């Protein structure tokens, strides 16, 4: 989950690749610039790229942070630490605190990817040892109390 929207993951990915030395900072700048230009085209009503694809990206890339904070119901967010989409989840409690939101639970599952599979040393998910049952049991237990 990334409350800042899906496009954020691509910006962060280029940055992380540069930080790790996988690409140069100039390459990261170029990648990010292309992402910005493509994203800008989605908001141009005269663009030929303005299609259902663009509409999909606009909806998935819209920040949901304010909506999330404004929810009156309890909020439970679980995420795998190895999911680039989840980087911002570490900061969510700060935003909740600023707005006085206290009915939330944010849980990081270390060394798991987006679908809660462990990551092997080769960097690939271990699909034989998924942790969905752990995540769901934790959520069910939390929801019974909230």
Residue ranges and their predicted role:
Residues 105, 110-146:
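Catalytic active-site module of serine/aspartate enzymes centered on a nucleophile-bearing elbow/loop
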Residues 74, 92-94:
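Conserved, well-ordered alpha-helix/loop/beta-strand core segments that scaffold catalytic motifs
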Residues 1-70:
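Accessory cap/linker subdomain of secreted extracellular hydrolases
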Residues 71, 77-79, 109:
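Short beta-strand/loop motif that positions the catalytic acidic residue
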Residues 4, 82-83, 113:
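Catalytic metal-binding/acid-base residues of hydrolase active sites
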Residues 82-91:
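Conserved alpha/beta-hydrolase "acid-adjacent" motif
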Residues 69-75, 102-103:
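Short, proline-enriched alpha-helix->beta-strand connector loops that line the catalytic pocket
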Residues 52-58, 76-82, 124-128:
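Second-shell loop/turn segments in exported
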């Amino acid at each position: 989950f990334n409350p800042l929207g899906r496009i954020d993951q691509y910006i962060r990915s280029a940055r992380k690749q540069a930080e790790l030395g996988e690409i140069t900072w100039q390459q990261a700048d170029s990648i990010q610039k292309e992402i910005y230009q493509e994203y800008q085209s989605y908001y141009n009503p005269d663009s030929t790229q303005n299609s259902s694809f663009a509409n999909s990206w606009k909806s998935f890339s819209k920040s949901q942070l304010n909506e999330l904070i404004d929810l009156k119901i309890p909020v439970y967010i679980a995420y795998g630490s190895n999911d680039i989409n989840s980087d911002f989840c570490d900061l969510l409690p700060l935003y909740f605190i600023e707005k006085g939101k206290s009915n939330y639970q944010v849980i990081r599952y270390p060394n798991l990817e987006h679908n809660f599979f462990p990551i092997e040393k080769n960097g690939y998910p271990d699909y034989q040892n998924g942790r969905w049952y752990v995540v769901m049991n934790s959520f069910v237990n939390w929801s019974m109390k909230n």
